[in-house]
Regions:
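A preference for well-ordered globular domain cores
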Residues: 1-208
């Protein structure tokens, strides 16, 4: 809590007032001493912590005859180039984090299945190798009841293997193109944290 000396306009805390009056015994709770007034707190103004700071100024006596805390926003940099450099430096870790999140989502979806013949087919590395093997087998693909991502099954065939291969290749290309566009948007934005990186992705399996 802050108090203002109504004569000198000096702002002081309880501890500072006690220290200035070592021979005075104050009760608990601490009363407003004579010659002082309680300063009601107010919210700090909005400011950019990269280029600005905020500091208390002399409290103001309101029309209600109460004192209120006042703030002042102060520019850190007087030179525009220094300010621009500080802003640019502050955006580097933000862009890096956003781009890492984009790549992580791209890779998650890459291994999160493709929809073929109304079935979600696994696209993890092992499954991709198996389907590639079936494509290479051509007409010799055995008819197997293949378990899909939702627990149901589908019968393997040459046509299915080709369709899965095509769908997987399309997914990969679409994911990489979309991730690249998002990264470009993040890198170009003066407010990279505001770029929406969660929507617009190609659909993958989201659970039964």
């Amino acid at each position: 809590m802050n108090y203002i000396n109504t004569e000198t306009q000096q702002l002081q805390t309880e501890a500072e007032i006690r220290a200035l009056n070592p021979n005075t015994s104050y009760p608990v709770p601490f009363p407003v001493p004579e010659g002082y007034a309680y300063v009601f707190p107010t919210a700090q103004p909005v400011y950019n912590p990269v280029t600005q700071t905020v500091q208390q100024t002399t409290p103001e006596l309101t029309v209600l005859d109460t004192w209120e805390q006042r703030w002042e926003v102060v520019e850190i940099y007087q030179n525009q180039q220094d300010k621009d450099d500080a802003i640019a430096a502050s955006l580097i870790p933000i862009r890096a984090a956003r781009n890492a999140a984009i790549r992580a989502e791209r890779d998650r979806r890459k291994f999160n299945g493709v929809l073929v013949s109304a079935k979600w087919i696994h696209t993890d590395t092992y499954s991709r190798t198996q389907w590639m093997g079936m494509v290479m087998m051509g007409a010799s693909v055995p008819a197997i009841e293949w378990t899909t991502m939702d627990g149901t099954s589908i019968t393997t065939s040459q046509a299915l293997a080709g369709a899965v291969f095509q769908a997987t290749a399309t997914l990969d290309a679409t994911l990489f193109a979309y991730a690249k566009s998002l990264i470009a948007a993040v890198d170009a934005s003066s407010d990279p944290a505001s770029v929406d990186i969660t929507t617009g992705w190609p659909a993958t399996f989201e659970g039964a």
